[in-house]
A protein has these predicted regions:
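Tandem CBS (Bateman) regulatory domains
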Residues: 1-16, 54-90, 97, 102-106, ...
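A glycine-centered beta-loop-beta connector
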Residues: 33-36, 41-57, 105, 113-130
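The conserved cystathionine-beta-synthase
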Residues: 20-37, 44, 91-109, 116, ...
């Protein structure tokens, strides 16, 4: 077993986390994506993780389907994140081992996972890059 995979999320996660509220508009979300170059944002209300919203979620606001006509640009940009976010979020605990993180990232095909405490308060985020940094540290020690 690779030793770095036994490290915990708490020692490798990114804090503080940039998050948004459910009332954030798609227009603001696009500006945040452009400024931060993130692929997704955790959605937090009163400190608790309530969802996650991705670039794909934001793009789907303007997608034309058989069931839905194309919305006006202003209406799409005014849409609140709570209308498009995923509420069923895969999140992990700070004491989770990187081995488990690696399995979850690949199983769910996501780039990062929110880290929450027992009360669902968002305490960090762990991304593929964080796991790669841990691997690099261990590689340099060898």
């Amino acid at each position: 077993m690779y030793e770095f995979l036994q490290e915990t999320v708490a020692n490798n996660m990114t804090t503080p986390v940039r998050s948004i509220t459910p009332e954030t508009t798609v227009g603001d979300l696009y500006r945040f994506f452009a400024a931060d170059d993130f692929d997704a944002y955790p959605v937090v209300q009163d400190g608790m993780l309530v969802g996650i919203v991705s670039k794909l979620d934001a793009l789907e606001v303007f997608a034309f389907t058989e069931d839905r006509i194309l919305p006006r640009y202003a209406d799409g940009m005014a849409t609140q994140v709570n209308k498009i976010m995923s509420s069923d979020v895969v999140a992990i605990d700070p004491e989770t081992k990187l081995q488990c993180v690696l399995q979850m990232l690949t199983k769910h095909k996501v780039k990062s996972l929110p880290v929450i405490d027992q009360r669902r308060n968002l305490v960090g985020i762990i991304a593929r890059e964080d796991v790669m940094r841990a691997m690099k540290r261990w590689t340099l020690r060898q």
